[in-house]
Every structure is written in structure tokens, then in C-alpha cells.
């Protein structure tokens, strides 16, 4: 079979035009083309057909130094990456090339990054709770095994720290495999995560086959083409683990889905498409749907996905975060107001929600305690204007008691994280679901009305709060 060879005719930033004149055959849309820039392989993805003989492509790598006239070869298929157990313990880029300096990834399984979502008949609808050990999450917005979870928050409120803690609490105790896709985030954070996983034994450098995680990075410094596709590359590896013979329960972490949308917007602008609301690409909902619909559980295995989602200017109605809401089973909203109070994780207990906070799934006691906690916090929120203007003394005795309990609940929702030990000096805590429910049940019933507020701040279980109260009382 003769190779379909073209030549570069135009380069504008990450957009490259290639002319095919040999036999008049144009590569299909989404096909991967290859060219070499000073011995470095560059992959181009076909985005548009222009006229009879030219295709417009998006580069998956920097185009600096690339010149017109360079030969381009059509690979005949979309971007294909190595999948399977050989990827464990390794870091690769969007096109499947290793970037950890440990040689090629020798995998017999190569897969296209574009696939259809599983058939309806194959999808599983079972609902089980995934215990994270984080009180505010487990009580008020519990996660589901095989569900899609979104962590929403503005800049600097703790999305990445929360994702790292979930990796620490869930992935390390988890029997199956984990895939982490770094989409347009800081290279330093990706490096920190890699070394942390080596230190904790999740990645075994001596015997990579014993590792439990595969990493796919397309960080902030990458061109928009790579950032727009790296989530699909990570998902392809997660799907391969899910569909293995014995079936696996796979954890799929993405940091950050907003950067996926942002990169799509950049690509769209480079291709000259007319923007839609707030300057986003007109295909925003389609792009998000194609990614999210593939993240699903089948009868063979499950993919539980945790996605950090940046909220521009703390506006949850921005089209990028708003489009992802529809796809999620649980949303954890991080609030700047709560972070300003020094309460971490800065999860908003009233904005966060979960489809599985249902008495049929979590049980009557859990549901009842969660709703009582939210009711007390909601009452406190509605009283804050009165307190700010008139002061606490003007409240009724009943309201004073509600405010006192709400402030204790607010502080008890804080928790020291394992991954933040180096910054806080406080030992990280993993709290079992039964202890979480029991602690908050006691609080709403007034069992701990005599304990000072400070005793509930940055502790794990209620027993620790009682011990702390004894120390505070001296």
C-alpha cells in the first residue's frame, strides 16, 4: 500500500495546512498525520477539508521551526496510543509517547483515542456509595462507585488538593487501576503527584507491572491541540482497563475539565469558527457530551471519574462549568467564602449535592442527619444579615441555639488532609462513614452543646473533638 504523502503549505501557530496532490485522496477528518521537525516527530490531526486537495490540521506539539514544504505522511487512522497494563507506572503525552525518560512503552495493544460510548444494553445502573473518608463529602454529597463527580471551584480554593486527597484515600486503598489525566494544569503539580505516588508505592519503579496507576499529561505549556485531546487519551486507557477480560473497577481523575473546554475554544478560534456565548466554541455541548458519555460503567467493569472543574470568576453560570453539570452524579462546590473562614476543605455544604443522597440508597439515618445538618446551616445563613445588623443578642433563644450548633457543624466539617500535612503540620485523618454520621447526629441532637466551638475545628472523629475540648478547658 502506497503512503499518502502531502506537503505543508501554511503554518499559523498551531494550525497547519497540508496539500495532497499525489493521488487526490484526502485524509479523513480526525486522521493523524506525521511529519518531522529536526528529527522530532510531530503529530497533526485533520480538522477541516479545504478545497479539493488541502486539509487544515491542529498540531499536537509546538510548531516552532516547522517550515513550508515539509513532507507529511497520512497514518490512515486517528491518534493511537498504547493501552493495557504496560502503561502502568508510566507517564505519556497525548500521542502516547513516554515523557518520563524510561524508554518506550512496549504494549501489544494500541487503541484509537476516539470511540463510541458503550451501548445502552451494556451499561450498568447499580448504585453503591464510594466512601472517601472526607466528612463533608461522605455526609452531604456522597460519591457513587462508577459515577461521575465534579469538583467545582474558582482559583485557589483547593480543587487540586481535594483531588490529591481523594487519590490518597481512595486510589491507594482501591484494588483496581487508576488513570490520572493532567489537562492544562501546572507541570509542577504533575511532577509532585508523580513523586508522591512513587513514595507511597502506588508506582513501583523497580517492577512497573506492580504499579496501580497510569499518568497522561498535557500541561499548561502544551499547544491547544494537545490540551484538547489529552482527556480523551487518558479516558482511552481507563476504558481499556475497564474492558479487560476479568473486568476492572477503574478510577479516572481529571484535573482540569475546564482546560479541556478552554483548549477546545482556542482550537475553534484558530479554525475560524464563529464563537458562541462568552466566546466559547459553538460545539461546546457536543465536545463535552462526547467525552462524558464515554465515562460510564458497563456490566464488565466500572469507571469512577473525579473531575476538577475550574469556575471562571467564581461564576457557576459560566457556560463551561454549566455544561458539565448535566453529566454529573455528584457535585462538590468549593466556596471562597468558606475558604476565607479558614475551613478546609472549603466545600459549600448547601451548594454541593448528590443524586445518591436518597434514603433508598444511603439509608434513612444518613439521609435524615444530612438533611438536618443542611437545615441548620440554611437557617444560620438566613440569620446572618440580622446578626450583622443587630447582633446576636437580638435573636430568640431558639435561634441562638441554632446559630451555636451551626457554627460547630461548620467547624466539624473541616478536616486535616494527609496531602497537606507538610503545610499544616497536622496529621491527616480518614473518617469512616459510621463515625461521620454518629458525630453529626450528636451535634444536631444537641449532645455536644456544652463543648467549645474551637474543639470541632480540624479534627477527624467526634472522639477527637471531645479530647480537644478537654485540652482547651485545661
Swiss-Prot record:
Q: What class of enzyme is it?
A: translocase
What does the record say about its membrane topology?
Answer: Peripheral membrane protein
Highest taxon of source: Bacteria
Q: Which Gene3D superfamilies match?
A: 2.40.10.170, Bovine Mitochondrial F1-atpase, Atp Synthase Beta Chain, Chain D, domain 3, P-loop containing nucleotide triphosphate hydrolases
Give the reaction(s) catalysed. Answer: ATP + H2O + 4 H(+)(in) = ADP + phosphate + 5 H(+)(out)
Q: Where does ATP bind?
A: 153-160
InterPro entries on file: AAA+_ATPase (IPR003593), ATP-synt_VA_C (IPR055190), ATP_synth_F1_bsu (IPR005722), ATPase_a/bsu_AS (IPR020003), ATPase_alpha/beta_chains (IPR050053), ATPase_F1/V1/A1_a/bsu_N (IPR004100), ATPase_F1/V1/A1_a/bsu_N_sf (IPR036121), ATPase_F1/V1/A1_a/bsu_nucl-bd (IPR000194)
Annotated membrane-spanning segments are none
GO cellular component terms?
Answer: plasma membrane; proton-transporting ATP synthase complex
Primary location class: membrane
Q: Which SUPFAM superfamilies match?
A: C-terminal domain of alpha and beta subunits of F1 ATP synthase, N-terminal domain of alpha and beta subunits of F1 ATP synthase, P-loop containing nucleoside triphosphate hydrolases
What are the EC numbers? Answer: 7.1.2.2
Q: Which GO terms describe its molecular function?
A: ATP binding; ATP hydrolysis activity; proton-transporting ATP synthase activity, rotational mechanism
Quaternary arrangement and interactors, per the entry? F-type ATPases have 2 components, CF(1) - the catalytic core - and CF(0) - the membrane proton channel. CF(1) has five subunits: alpha(3), beta(3), gamma(1), delta(1), epsilon(1). CF(0) has three main subunits: a(1), b(2) and c(9-12). The alpha and beta chains form an alternating ring which encloses part of the gamma chain. CF(1) is attached to CF(0) by a central stalk formed by the gamma and epsilon chains, while a peripheral stalk is formed by the delta and b chains.
Task: Give the family per the record.
Answer: Belongs to the ATPase alpha/beta chains family.
The protein in question is named ATP synthase subunit beta
Amino acid at each position: 500500500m502506497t503512503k499518502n504523502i502531502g506537503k505543508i503549505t501554511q503554518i499559523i501557530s498551531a494550525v497547519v495546512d497540508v496539500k495532497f496532490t499525489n493521488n487526490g485522496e484526502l485524509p479523513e477528518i480526525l486522521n493523524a498525520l506525521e511529519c518531522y521537525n529536526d528529527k522530532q516527530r510531530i503529530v497533526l490531526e485533520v480538522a477541516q477539508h479545504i478545497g479539493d486537495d488541502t486539509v487544515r490540521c491542529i498540531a499536537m506539539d509546538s510548531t516552532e521551526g516547522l517550515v513550508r514544504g515539509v513532507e507529511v505522511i497520512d497514518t490512515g487512522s486517528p491518534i493511537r496510543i498504547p493501552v493495557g497494563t504496560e502503561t502502568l507506572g508510566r507517564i505519556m503525552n497525548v500521542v502516547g509517547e513516554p515523557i518520563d525518560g524510561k524508554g518506550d512503552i512496549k504494549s501489544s495493544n494500541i487503541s484509537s483515542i476516539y470511540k463510541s460510548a458503550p451501548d445502552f444494553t451494556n451499561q450498568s445502573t447499580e448504585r453503591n456509595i464510594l466512601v472517601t473518608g472526607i466528612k463533608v463529602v461522605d455526609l452531604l454529597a456522597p460519591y457513587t462507585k462508577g459515577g461521575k463527580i465534579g469538583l467545582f471551584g474558582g482559583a485557589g480554593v483547593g480543587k487540586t488538593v481535594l483531588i490529591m486527597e481523594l487519590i490518597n484515600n481512595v486510589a491507594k486503598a482501591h484494588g483496581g487501576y487508576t488513570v490520572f489525566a493532567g489537562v492544562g494544569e501546572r507541570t509542577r503539580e504533575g511532577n509532585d503527584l508523580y513523586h508522591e505516588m512513587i513514595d507511597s508505592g502506588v508506582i513501583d519503579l523497580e517492577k512497573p507491572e506492580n504499579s496501580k496507576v497510569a499518568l497522561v499529561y498535557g500541561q499548561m505549556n502544551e499547544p491547544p491541540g494537545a490540551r484538547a485531546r489529552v482527556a480523551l487519551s487518558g479516558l482511552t486507557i481507563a476504558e481499556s482497563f475497564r474492558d479487560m477480560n476479568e473486568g476492572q473497577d477503574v478510577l479516572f481523575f481529571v484535573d482540569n475539565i475546564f482546560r479541556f473546554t478552554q483548549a477546545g475554544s482556542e482550537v475553534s478560534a484558530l479554525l475560524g469558527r464563529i464563537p458562541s456565548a462568552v466566546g466559547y466554541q459553538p460545539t461546546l455541548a457536543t465536545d463535552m457530551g462526547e467525552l462524558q458519555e464515554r465515562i460510564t460503567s458497563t456490566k464488565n467493569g466500572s469507571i469512577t471519574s473525579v473531575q476538577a472543574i475550574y469556575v471562571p470568576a467564581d461564576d457557576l453560570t459560566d457556560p463551561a462549568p454549566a455544561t458539565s453539570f448535566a453529566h454529573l452524579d455528584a457535585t462538590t462546590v468549593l466556596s471562597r467564602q468558606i475558604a476565607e473562614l479558614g475551613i478546609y476543605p472549603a466545600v459549600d455544604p448547601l451548594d454541593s449535592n448528590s443524586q445518591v443522597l436518597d434514603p433508598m440508597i444511603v439509608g434513612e439515618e444518613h439521609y435524615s442527619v444530612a438533611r438536618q445538618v443542611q437545615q441548620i446551616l440554611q437557617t444560620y445563613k438566613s440569620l446572618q444579615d440580622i446578626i450583622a445588623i443587630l447582633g446576636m443578642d437580638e435573636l430568640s433563644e431558639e435561634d441562638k441555639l441554632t446559630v451555636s450548633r451551626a457554627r460547630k457543624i461548620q467547624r466539624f466539617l473541616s478536616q486535616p488532609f494527609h496531602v497537606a500535612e507538610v503545610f499544616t503540620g497536622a496529621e491527616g485523618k480518614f473518617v469512616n462513614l459510621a463515625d461521620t454520621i454518629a458525630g453529626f447526629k450528636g451535634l444536631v441532637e444537641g449532645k455536644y452543646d456544652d463543648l467549645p466551638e474551637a474543639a470541632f475545628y480540624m479534627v477527624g472523629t467526634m472522639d477527637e473533638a471531645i479530647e480537644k475540648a478537654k485540652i482547651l478547658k485545661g
